[in-house]
């Protein structure tokens, strides 16, 4: 084995020289240069600095403007809440531990950090799935006369929390476990060992199938069908400039959504699966660090994609930030009037929210 396994940790370094120490008790500067820990702390500070305001602003603006309190926006708010979970439950602790060079918060802190980071990430992931299903139901109309209402939104919220808990809770109760990973300053699922009594293998397979592959298939299916529906509407009314604009807008939105989903999760999932299927092979501490912390950046670009592309929300946000006035009101108004409408794709169905 090209690593050192101990009680509730795995260090990606063989302890031939005797320098390997518990990541709960000693700085891990023998893994990487101390400057790397400082850089990690600075990166986490940047995520907090940007992630907290943009997600808090999402909640505040929606509460401030009654017209934004629509059933679909409940899911978008859920996305913001999930991102705040990641900011407070994961980013702050990682910034603090990276300043010390090891997971100074101990075993309990590792469980809490791993749980909140996993919970927030999974709530966000399943919120995107619910959004994809809602867009498909409204635009493609597999059920005639379907209208997404408050009851559907509440069921969607409950679904995201149940699925997230189904992934984040088991490691706390003995099905797998949370351990420090990468540079040993943050905690995640144990992909690294076959620790006796924790059934890591079955949990990792369950997690990949139910909490990665299935969401991926659903997102691709729903947005693929949505894009086809918009193309069909545009083909039926080729003379309509607004319909052509609808096709372009939705195409751009779909591409951004799918690419962001892949950029966020595929590197982390790919590296985690490689480590799981090649346990004991040689890899450095940065091998898992880069994809893990890149995935955390979803707390920033998720709200930018799913909320800031919403014309109505953008108008309300500018109004809130500018003390009740929107200096770009004419431009926003012109943009709103040109909002796409088609016989088979309504304007509310085409816009991101």
Curated annotation (Swiss-Prot):
The modification N6-(retinylidene)lysine is found at residue 296. Its main location: membrane. Residues 330-353 are annotated as: Disordered. Phosphorylated on some or all of the serine and threonine residues present in the C-terminal region. Contains one covalently linked retinal chromophore. A motif ('Ionic lock' involved in activated form stabilization) lies at residues 134-136. Disulfide bonds join 110-187. Glycans are attached at residues 2, 15, 200. PROSITE patterns: G_PROTEIN_RECEP_F1_1 (PS00237), G_PROTEIN_RECEP_F1_2 (PS50262), OPSIN (PS00238). A lipid is attached at residues 322-323 (S-palmitoyl cysteine). Residues 62-73, 134-152, 225-252, 309-353 are cytoplasmic. PANTHER family: OPSIN. This is Rhodopsin. It comes from Chelon saliens (Leaping mullet).
């Amino acid at each position: 084995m090209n690593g050192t396994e101990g009680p509730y940790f795995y260090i990606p370094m063989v302890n031939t020289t005797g320098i390997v120490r518990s990541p709960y008790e000693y700085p891990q500067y023998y893994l990487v240069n101390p400057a790397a820990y400082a850089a990690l702390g600075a990166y986490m500070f940047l995520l907090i600095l940007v992630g907290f305001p943009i997600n808090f602003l999402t909640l505040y603006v929606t509460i401030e403007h009654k017209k934004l309190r629509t059933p679909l926006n409940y899911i978008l708010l859920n996305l913001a809440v999930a991102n705040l979970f990641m900011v407070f439950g994961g980013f702050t602790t990682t910034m603090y531990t990276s300043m010390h060079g090891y997971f100074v918060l101990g075993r309990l802190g590792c469980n809490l950090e791993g749980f909140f980071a996993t919970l927030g990430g999974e709530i966000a992931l399943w919120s995107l799935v619910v959004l994809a299903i809602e867009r498909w139901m409204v635009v493609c109309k597999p059920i005639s006369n379907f209208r997404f209402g408050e009851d559907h939104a509440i069921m969607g919220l409950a679904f995201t929390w149940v699925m997230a808990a189904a992934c984040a809770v088991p490691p706390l109760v003995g099905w797998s476990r949370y351990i420090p990973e990468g540079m040993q300053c943050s905690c995640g699922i144990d992909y690294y060992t076959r620790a006796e009594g924790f059934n890591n293998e079955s949990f990792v397979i369950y997690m990949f199938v139910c909490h990665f592959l299935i969401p991926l298939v659903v997102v691709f299916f729903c947005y693929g069908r949505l894009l086809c529906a918009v193309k069909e509407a545009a083909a039926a009314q080729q003379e309509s400039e607004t319909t052509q604009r609808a096709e372009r807008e939705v195409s751009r939105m779909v591409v951004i959504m799918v690419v962001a989903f892949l950029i966020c999760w595929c590197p982390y999932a790919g590296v985690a699966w490689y480590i799981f299927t090649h346990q004991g092979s040689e890899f450095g501490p940065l091998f898992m660090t880069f994809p893990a912390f890149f995935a955390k950046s979803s707390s920033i670009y998720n709200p930018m994609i799913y909320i800031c592309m919403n014309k109505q929300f953008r108008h309300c946000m500018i109004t809130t930030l500018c003390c009740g006035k929107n200096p770009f009101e004419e431009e926003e108004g012109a943009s709103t009037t040109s909002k796409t409408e088609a016989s088979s794709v309504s304007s509310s169905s085409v816009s991101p929210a």
